[in-house]
Amino acid sequence: MNKIRCALIGPGNIGTDLLYKLRRSDILEPVWMVGVEPSSEGLARARELGLKTTSDGIDGLLPHLEADDIRIAFDATSAYVHAEHSARLTARGVRVIDLTPAAIGPFCVPPVNLDAHIGSNEMNVNMVTCGGQATIPMVYAVSRVQPVAYGEIVATVSSRSVGPGTRRNIDEFTRTTAGAIEAVGGARQGKAIIVINPAEPPLIMRDTIHCLTDDAPDVAAITASVHDMIAEVRKYVPGYTLKNGPVFDGKRVSIFLEVEGLGDYLPKYAGNLDIMTASAARTAECIAAAMRAGSAQESANA
């Protein structure tokens, strides 16, 4: 069966790493890479890999959507331009996976709520943030056992792995992640902190998650839930590792993670970017599988 064809908007670190992951997919075919700088290294690399490219932004892509049968588009640009991109793409029937903090569509954290989004046929889903993808599964692992009054995460990332787009979006990062800790993670109140570490050599992404439960924590149930969720995330992020915990102190549950990347395009220390691209690829593959199943059902009914 033919692969589902995709476009990538934004040829920076995230867009380029995502391209490498999509090229390995059994169900997705990356066809277009869209940028705004003719001299972009990401566009040049995409051309070398056989993709069609444009430096005219989304205006350069739209006329080709139908002819090239683009069904899914990934937006790895900026929260400030995503609204326009999404409106123009979804109006043409293209499903959008948003890797910016814009959060126009509902938050998607694959092991927590991806199945629900596929069932509701959402046209735009938001991948939260790198910190959100790394930590929200842990908040949810606690909240699915018992109510969580407060969830706080600290994402520590290497300065080298944080590009200009992420730096411009720091405020959006913290707001979006905190909102998703509540909406997806299940905490009644959420807080997110990002620490950009300039250490050399660069450090692998580290995440700390603190949850305050309403009642005394069920140690055995929460520990089992956390380990089950670690295994789920490792299916698509093999470098997702529990370094310590869960640690229990009164009503506080603390979990300590490390996220190492696959090293597709980005260095392995850039696990913060790798978990975003891996989560987006996982989401798109599940959406594409649902598209295929729907097409097969239509053919059977014809």
UniProtKB/Swiss-Prot annotation:
Key words, A-Z: Aromatic hydrocarbons catabolism, NAD, Oxidoreductase
Coiled-coil regions listed: none
Active site residues according to the UniProt entry: C130
SUPFAM superfamilies associated with the record: Glyceraldehyde-3-phosphate dehydrogenase-like, C-terminal domain, NAD(P)-binding Rossmann-fold domains
Enzyme class per UniProt: oxidoreductase
Any one biological process term the GO annotation gives: catabolic process
Alphabetical list of Pfam families matching this protein: AcetDehyd-dimer (PF09290)
InterPro entries cross-referenced by the UniProt entry: Acetaldehyde_dehydrogenase (IPR003361), Acetylaldehyde_DH_C (IPR015426), NAD(P)-bd_dom_sf (IPR036291), Semialdehyde_DH_NAD-bd (IPR000534)
Catalysis: reaction(s): acetaldehyde + NAD(+) + CoA = acetyl-CoA + NADH + H(+)
Residues noted as binding NAD(+) in the record, renumbered to the chain: S161, V162, G163, P164, G165, T166, R167, R168, N169, N272
Gene Ontology MF terms: acetaldehyde dehydrogenase (acetylating) activity; NAD binding
EC number, as in UniProt: 1.2.1.10
Superkingdom as given in the UniProt entry: Bacteria
Keyword Oxidoreductase: yes
NCBIfam families assigned: ac_ald_DH_ac, PRK08300.1
HAMAP family cross-referenced by the UniProt entry: Ac_ald_DH_ac
Family designation: Belongs to the acetaldehyde dehydrogenase family.
Protein name, UniProt field: Acetaldehyde dehydrogenase 2
